[in-house]
Regions:
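Charged, solvent-exposed interaction patches on well-folded alpha/beta domains
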Residues: 3-27, 32-172
Length: 172
């Protein structure tokens, strides 16, 4: 906001362009929503909702990005996040349609979130999971195919419940 000359502190309330502030904040690839408004008491309120990455993609083709909880691509930053890293044969379509729901399912389960360090996608789109504990790799197979986004998420959740229940018994 300062760089664009619209920082509201020290500016008369009538000269503050709240719409422009909202538009500027919304342009950030890390902002999901931005709201800005003035009150009758002469205050300016700015509310920003951050996009939440669920998985980091480091594909063999050189792509490096995050996918958020709305299945949208986000650029990487200089900061690291404690997220699962997906490597291998990954294109953006597969990352947003299959790996993002898989990441959301894993991150929603406290044990899986702490157990799984990496997901590797093989050339036939089979999935391997690399746990934080031990020096082994777990092959879980291909994720279920579904055309509908909601059905796909439910199918991936059911698939992971079955696969990870077996693996969870091994670690308990």
């Amino acid at each position: 906001l300062q760089k664009n000359g619209i920082y509201p502190i020290g500016i008369e309330i009538c000269k503050i362009d709240t719409r422009r502030i909202e538009e500027m904040l919304s342009k950030s690839p890390f902002v999901q929503t931005a709201n800005c408004y003035k009150t009758e008491g002469g205050h300016v309120y700015i509310s920003v909702t951050q996009r939440m990455p669920v998985i980091r993609i480091k594909a063999e083709n050189g792509d490096d990005y995050y996918v958020d909880d709305n299945d949208c691509v986000m650029p990487t930053t200089h900061y690291t996040s404690d997220l699962i890293i997906a490597t291998g044969n990954i294109n953006r379509w597969y990352a947003t349609n299959y790996l993002s729901p898989l990441g959301r399912v894993i991150m929603a389960n406290e044990m899986w979130k702490n157990l799984i360090e990496q997901i590797n996608v093989l050339p036939n789109y089979s999935i391997e999971i690399v746990p934080r504990i031990g020096d082994h790799i777990v092959h879980i197979g291909r994720l279920p195919d579904c055309k509908n986004r909601t059905e796909r998420f439910a199918a991936i959740k059911k698939f992971m419940d079955v696969k990870m229940t077996r693996l969870s018994k091994f670690y308990k």
